[in-house]
Amino acid sequence: MAKIITFDDIDIEFKKLYEELSKQESYTTGVVYEVFNIFTLKSYIGKAHSYVKNGNQPVRRQGAKGRFYKHWKSCHNGENDCPIFYEALRNSDPQEWAVIILKVCSLKHLKEWETKMIERLDTSNPDKGYNYFVGDNKPNNPEYLVKYQSAKATSNAERAVSGALKKKAHNKDLPANINYRKKINKNGSIGEGYFVQIKIDGHLYNKAFLSGTMSMEAKLEAAKKTLEKFKQEAASKRAKRTKPSGSKTTRSTGRK
């Protein structure tokens, strides 16, 4: 998959509606969004800041689409912050989901509006949605809570078994300190390769090889060479530390 394309990118009416509402966003606003599956007719409702800043990076637009992208990336990178929703994402294609802006509001009222929309659309009902939480709280309905806890436990168990089997299959023939790695790039493409990591004398050495221009064989070979380089570098540092401090060169004075 070269790029994440959602249903609202394909459907003209959905696209026009999203673009029109996104014009209301600014640096002081956030959005309450709905992610709607066109086949199951179930939704997930969440909130997002219109603009975000990470570390030293410049401020960038996030909004509903940016937040959905993060959910998609997270669920395929082994995270499970929203267990029921992430399980649904993992078992689907992005084209099955429409990202809809429900409300643009000030950041101050973002949480309040998220809770209102979850209650209004009843997406904490397992028959209608994927929201385990109503805002930051668990659903009040005991029946919903039991259903979600059961689904969450099943999701976590299946994910644990699946993840363990995948990791074992990918890494069983690899050298120690080299692991298979897969990630979704910023443009939505999937990158895969190898990750070298080793800790020697308290120092952690690591490097990833995920370039799309290299074959998997070339990436593995590069990873092996880098691992040896890390070991040599660590050995060199150790040798310098253990060199006798009193070993000075004696200079002849010419006297007898």
Swiss-Prot record:
Coiled-coil features, chain-numbered ranges: 213-243
Segments for region (Disordered): 231-256
Assigned keywords, A-Z: Coiled coil
Residue spans of biased composition, Polar residues class: 244-256
Record's protein name: Uncharacterized protein R502
